Design a protein with these regions (language model features):
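Extreme N-terminal tail/first-helix region
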Residues: 1-17
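Charged, gly/pro-rich active-site loop segments
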Residues: 2-3, 74-132
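Short alpha-helical scaffold segments that flank and stabilize functional sites
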Residues: 11, 25, 85-87
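Short beta-strand segments
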Residues: 16-49, 57, 65-67, 76-79
Length: 132
């Protein structure tokens, strides 16, 4: 398993958007902007059951996540390729934490009735970067 450096982890901890790439059933890539986080070892993002990312990852857990610094996109990037693990445990708390980080709200305001959130944990197999 590859490891994030502290500088790379800080980029995921910051108020920077990530791009998640999953694989469609036909093998073509599907890229989506997401709110991101890290536990220092893995990359984390949140989605809802039934969304394309979640369906793709249940079928094929290979995933890539790239982050650029929001304040200086010329300074580099970090891209993590790895394997996704999906859990509902703690997902609502996680999306609330991300809402606080990205939009300054204590509760995620876009939760739909009946929506079930999941945390996706990306275990890095490879870390590529430039400037980080």
């Amino acid at each position: 398993m590859a490891k994030l450096s502290e500088k790379q982890a800080e980029l995921f901890r910051g108020k920077n958007w990530g791009t998640v790439v999953t694989l469609r059933e036909d093998g073509s890539p599907h890229a989506t902007p997401v709110w991101i986080d890290t536990d220092g070892e893995n990359v984390l993002f949140n989605t809802a059951i039934g969304r394309a990312k979640e369906r793709h990852l249940r079928r094929d857990p290979r995933v890539a996540v790239t982050v650029l610094p929001a304040d200086d996109q010329q300074s580099g990037y970090v891209s993590v390729s790895g394997t996704a693990e999906i859990t509902e445990e703690g997902a609502n708390d996680h999306i609330d934490k991300l809402a606080k980080k990205y939009i300054g709200q204590d509760k995620y305001p876009y939760l739909q009735p009946g929506e079930r959130r999941v945390v996706v944990t990306v275990k890095p197999d490879k870390v590529d970067s430039m400037g980080s």
